Amino acid sequence: MYSMMMETDLHSPGVQPPNNTGQGGGNKASQDRVKRPMNAFMVWSRGQRRKMAQENPKMHNSEISKRLGAEWKVMSEAEKRPFIDEAKRLRALHMKEHPDYKYRPRRKTKTLLKKDKYSLAGGLLHAAGGGHMGVGLSPGGGGGGCGGAGGMVVQRMESPGSGASTGGYAHMNGWANGAYPGSVAAAAAAAMMQEAQLAYSQQQQQHPGSGGHHPHHHPHHPHHHPHHHPHHNPTSHPTPPQPMHRYDMSALQYSPLPGAQTYMSASPSSYGALSYSSSQQQHQGSPSSAAVAAAAAAASSGALGVLGSLVKSEPSVSPPVSGGGSHNRPPCPGDLREMISMYLPGGGEAGDPAAAAAAAAAAAAATSRLHSLPQHYQGTGTGITSTMPLTHI
């Protein structure tokens, strides 16, 4: 069988050189596209491909090539020798006909351009994302001294703000550029928008320069509070503990986007009650009583608008409280009783006996709840759970 194939293959290249010479003797356009000389495998596979295609007319050309390559690999050197010699003769003939021939690969440049195009798009996306975060955080100082619960956010904020804005963004998301799957791309875009919003709130809070004015920005960016307050308390008003915990009623479950939506939906309605709540809060001397008042009002009325107004109209300078710790101060039942009696719908003033009785019952339930929970972070833990049972009043 191999002798027959060798005969056909050895005779067919004898017909090929006139074709090549005729092609070379044609017009100049055909001379520009000169094919390379066949190697030994091509010399052998040309006849074999024709034969296999006739035997299997439905077989694809790629499958034929796979089978031919597998057969060529298992052939011995003695069986390949005549085809190797024929390939050498064809190469010598090709060099004689085209002495100045130089192989110029054309498809390789196209694939390289395609890869460069994709890498360029990924680089532009990388630079745009990192540059946006760097611009958003550079006025805010990159979140300087945040600590505690906001450690991960601080790490995300400091890497763009410290000058590595274009280099550190891929490490924030955890994905390389251009490598997002379909569903992950939406999540990454949402995370990018959320971090940009964090950066904007950071810039707005740092820009006025006064630590006491920062509550005016919080109703618009509520998901920033737990990470931002630990470095505001020691600088502007170190002794009162409650301004740090006053905003945590809306963020019952701290998921950044839903908490922000519920709080932002409640904050526009809060401006109507601004004057009344501000006058009521000016009469109260202790910031802890204002915080408890906010919790009781939100729980008893069932609306977050009063809480939003209290947050909006918090006085910028709070009176110092002697010996108050930042996190571990126990709740004050007397203040809670007074403020609940003020905000109850039945009477409003502390002198009303019915309101006083209801306030005493509510305060007892609240204090029992408060003392049953760990005291280590009262703003988010006890401030939420203590006011939830008051809704039945």
From Swiss-Prot:
UniProt-recorded Gene Ontology molecular function terms: DNA-binding transcription activator activity, RNA polymerase II-specific; RNA polymerase II cis-regulatory region sequence-specific DNA binding
DNA-binding region, residue intervals: 34-102
Superkingdom as given in the UniProt entry: Eukaryota
InterPro entries named among the record's database cross-references: HMG_box_dom, HMG_box_dom_sf, SOX_fam, SRY-related_HMG-box_TF-like
Annotated Pfam families: HMG_box, SOXp
CDD domains: HMG-box_SoxB
Chain intervals for the UniProt region annotation (Disordered): 1-34, 197-247, 315-334, 374-393
Compositional bias (Low complexity): 197-208
Cellular component, GO annotation: nucleus
Keyword terms of this UniProt record: Activator, Developmental protein, DNA-binding, Nucleus, Transcription, Transcription regulation
Tissues in which the protein is found: Expressed in the animal hemisphere at early cleavage stages and in the presumptive ectoderm in the late blastula embryo. At gastrula stage (stage 10.5), expressed weakly in the anterior ectoderm distant from the blastopore. At neural plate stages (stage 13), expression appears in the anterior neural plate. At neural fold stage (stage 20), strongly expressed in the anterior of the neural tube. At stages 23 and 25, expression increases in the presumptive brain and appears in the optic vesicle. At tail bud stages, strongly expressed in the brain, eye and weakly in the spinal cord.
Intracellular or extracellular location(s): Nucleus
Inducers of expression: By bmp-antagonism.
Segments of skewed composition (Polar residues): 375-393
Motif (9aaTAD): 338-346
Its biological purpose: Transcriptional activator. Participates in neural induction.
Protein name: Transcription factor Sox-1
Gene that produces this protein: sox1
